[in-house]
């Protein structure tokens, strides 16, 4: 069936078609509803890229003749900073930016950037599946954006040019952060210097010394080869990096009911399947990083408590934006894990 995996040519802005055994090369047919899905990661090592590929394969197989989904990975169409505006203009129909990228449209998702909010991925999954978590998917409806599903990446780790074992080790170092005021405050709490930078620019920033460190999941550290230009990784599990699959309310509400219902069902099934495997993907990437000879420092309970104590004041700074009731709901669930 027709499935597009768009990749950018190295020297131009052209987009090339890539076909694999699981993806036939026919173009979208006349009369089909075309859904362009734009994301910023690779297609085979990253939980989001794997999930987007799986979603398109299901849609193009099961909705042949009705819907055609094209996937544009690796920022070949838009980066996360521009994709939401493109979606509102109708140039993209689906995307899955990290939860940090919705600052312009809602402050509620700052909850997911607050350091040490959740103990593990099970707690995160339970909260996102709860009534409070599900209600948060509609936080941007008045701005024309509808949240469809939460997609997991994983827990964030720290990497730097020097070992990071205590909070004082980060002092004075420049760390890349996403465009999130919470993450800026998080690194300022460590007396570090946060620098907002696009995901696509991080490798070069680390290589050139513009930044000395960054926070990310193992899948991002391995998939984007950040480990090549970092001396070590610290397994801190201090935060989460998750995504929300979104669409525009105009596009979604304009779909025939049967089409919308079938898309919802397929997306839900892909989400459950891929979220369950995100931990294994990150663990495999962790092992791959270790196999290159890079050192991975696993914090002791005492060391992790020091990092938590240093970062926890950030909660108070943003509790009004997030909503104390949302923090309380998250912590009530977190206490069960």
Predicted ranges, named:
Residues 25-123, 131-132, 140-337:
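N-terminal secretory/targeting leader peptides
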Residues 1-34, 337:
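Short, low-complexity disordered leader/linker segments with a strong preference
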Residues 17, 135-140:
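Short, solvent-exposed secondary-structure boundary motifs
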